[in-house]
Swiss-Prot record:
The keyword Hydrolase does not apply. Belongs to the universal ribosomal protein uS14 family. This is Small ribosomal subunit protein uS14. It comes from the Bacteria. It comes from Shewanella frigidimarina (strain NCIMB 400). NCBIfam families: PRK08881.1. Binds 16S rRNA, required for the assembly of 30S particles and may also be responsible for determining the conformation of the 16S rRNA at the A site. Part of the 30S ribosomal subunit. Contacts proteins S3 and S10. It holds the Pfam family Ribosomal_S14.
Amino acid sequence: MAKTSMKAREAKRAQLVAKYAEKRLALKAIISSPATSEEDRWDAVLKLQALPRDSSAARQRNRCNQTGRPHGFLRKFGLSRIKLREATMRGEVPGLRKASW
């Protein structure tokens, strides 16, 4: 089970990403636009760098909803491979069962 502080850190990152998403998108549009002058582009780059580091979506880590485990995470179910197997064996995942051939 992941430490509570790690889960809280990820929650804080998710909150920051949501808060600054529009601002980051606008600045990136200015930077990538060929019609933007070099001076405006440079100002946008500096403003983007001034934003909090954790407001970037690339710094988020997918974690298991039950345990907080960062590895072996399956997006479709929101669980780690271990918890998904346990839930499947209990019959809690509709349409999923142990393979047999």
